[in-house]
Amino acid sequence: IWLIVHHMAGTESIALGGSVRIDAFSNFFSIVIVVATLSIVLATRTWADTLERSIEFYALLLTAAASMSILTQASDLITIFIAIETTSISQFILVAIVKDDKGAEAGLKYLLTGAVAAAVLLYGFVFLFGVSGVVSLDQILNFAESAPEEYRLVLLLSLMFIVAGLGYKMA
């Protein structure tokens, strides 16, 4: 919160050794995430109160929202992966929070497809790190702009894995 308030004073904030960057882009999407989360809380209030685990529902919803907000602020591959997986784990549990066979089946299927997507995404990140030697998005961009011709295919392959993993996660 301090970093967001500090940025609103007109400066860009960088924290955690450059892993997190607060700027106008991340502030805008963090606000969108907060508004969406509040809308979900208001829309599901009566339904969530009927659950045995209503406290867990709200805790998981807030965990997913916080990790999505961190994702908008991430500036390296490790932070991106941790934020995506934290969001995913919260969503896996939210899918299976209702105690019935359909909820358990849906949660397990979502977990398995999410694990495959995470593996594909991480494989792309490994290729990207392997060819560039860095995890910072700024440094990766600088490397990609000046990469020798023999690295272009590996960069393209890593991009394909990353897009496939992210696309699979979003689907």
Q: What positions do the PLM features span?
A:
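Alpha-helical transmembrane segments of multi-pass membrane proteins predominantly involved
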Residues: 1-171
